[in-house]
Amino acid sequence: MSAGKPKQEFFALEREDLVHLEKQRAFVHELARRLDLSPSFSGNVGDLQILQKIVDASALSASQTWELQSLGIVLGDVFASQHGLRWVMVEDEYGRDPALRFQNTSNLVFPLTMISKRIEDGKEVDLQAIYEGVSAYIAEFTE
């Protein structure tokens, strides 16, 4: 047996997955409203500014993993709408997580933890830089 990448399987989002993602989006919308930010997320790059304001306000602590990952879902919605990716569930030896898939390829982006891991590790979160870096990575999918 070769030591390589863990085997990944892709699945369409099931109803339960859709409900969970919608709960996470609703949490972020409500948090933005409570912070007097425009809670109108549209999937465009302007959403990055709202997410950055939430992060900069330190509205969530490093221990609030689900809530921080909810920010990652909204970030993922920006990648999806701007780069033609679609949400899928990816299952491997480590578990089952939402990811963004490029067409029917194995090219994936995992936005769920892009914000949470940085905050949990005490690192700066620059959403514009994250967006630009991941966008460059996504551009390689079409080369």
Can you annotate each of these PLM segments?
Residues S2-T65:
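N-terminal low-complexity, intrinsically disordered segments
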Residues G4-K5, L21, D77, S81, ...:
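Generic detection of intrinsically disordered/low-complexity segments and helix-coil linkers/edges
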Residues L13, L18, V28-E30, M89, ...:
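Domain-length accessory/inserted modules outside core catalytic folds
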Residues I54-S58, Q82-H83, R118-G122:
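Generic structural signal for hydrophobic core residues of well-folded globular domains
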Residues W66-R118:
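Amphipathic protein-protein interaction modules
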